[in-house]
A protein has these predicted regions:
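Extracellular structured ligand-interaction cores
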Residues: 65-69, 83-85, 114, 126-127
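Conserved metal-binding segment of the jelly-roll/cupin
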Residues: 98-121
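Short, solvent-exposed aromatic-acidic interface loops
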Residues: 88-94, 108, 133-135
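A short, N-terminal "cap"/entry segment at the start of jelly-roll beta-barrel domains
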Residues: 1-60
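Short basic alpha-helical hairpin corresponding to helix-turn-helix/winged-helix-like nucleic-acid-binding
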Residues: 54-57, 61-73
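A short beta-strand-loop-beta hairpin characteristic of the jelly-roll/cupin
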Residues: 71-102, 140-143
Length: 146
């Protein structure tokens, strides 16, 4: 499409299917990342199709930005049942709390809050992880414990 007055506000990115994309641990399924440079601001949005059980983030870590994690089943006739268990640990030491979602839901992680591991268990159908960072032109983390 030719450049027009508003074409700068339309962003097209291909899905990255990769052979198997290994980051810290485990396979992150087909995904697309929209970074601050795409929007010319400090907002990052990542969409990942999770297809198998894995530890997505193995270690506790923090961010200096707010993070939102939405989990949605990719089954059009049942938008409530995730078809898996998704666990996120908040806090560290004696303050650790494990929280588990088995239905459509979201985790909000304010900046500075220690969190992780982030685990997908018993995955029986694909799940969409929508991952947003506000105040961050890209996703990054500072590990707290290994």
């Amino acid at each position: 499409m030719a450049d027009t007055k508003y074409s700068q506000y339309v962003i097209r990115k291909p899905i990255d299917y990769g052979d198997k994309i290994y980051y810290d641990v485990g396979y992150y399924g087909p995904n697309v990342w929209y970074k601050g440079e795409d929007y010319k601001n400090d907002f990052t949005m990542i969409f990942i199709r999770v297809e198998e059980s894995m530890i997505m983030e193995e270690y506790a870590h923090v961010h200096d930005f707010d993070m939102y994690l939405w989990l949605l089943p990719l089954e059009p006739n049942n938008m409530e049942d995730l078809g898996c268990e998704v666990e996120l640990v908040f806090g560290s030491g004696d303050e650790k709390e494990k929280h588990i979602l088995t239905k459509t839901g979201s985790f909000f992680v304010p900046k500075g809050i220690v969190h992780g591991p982030f685990t997908f268990r018993n995955v029986t159908k694909p799940v969409l992880l929508a991952h947003a960072c506000t105040g961050a032109a890209d996703y990054y983390k500072t590990e707290v414990f290994k």
